[in-house]
Amino acid sequence: MGNAVYLDRDFLYNIRKKELEKTMTLIDEFTIQKTFVEWARKQDFIILCFAVPNGFKASSRAALMMKREGLLPGVPDVFCLLKNGKWAIVEFKTEIGKVSPQQKVIIDKLLDHKQAVAVCRSTREAVLFVKQVYNGEFVI
């Protein structure tokens, strides 16, 4: 057979498993954030709730244009303006997701300036955080 290449089944399985884990992580983070935003937009004590499109995959040209317009890597995922005048800022991660160095810098700057920001790993966690900020129970 000369030039034939045979791949080990375990090798192929591990590649597929890694790709599946990446996909599931993205889906899970998307679902957590989507569910939270749906909840937030139904609450009377939340005036405004919006997402920042930092996770959006764009062509290199589009990404360059977005950066020139002010897109800043590391900005948290969702901002909620509450009726008490405070912001509740949420970075969503899965159970295994990690905060990037850029995200840590931005989160630290927000905390240094007395902004309520949290990394939440579930919709429930984000809901509790926002309620704590609104009720004055979240102390920076």
Listing of model-derived features with the role each one plays in the protein:
Residues 1-140:
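Catalytic phosphate/metal-binding cores of nucleic-acid and nucleotide-processing enzymes, i.e., regions
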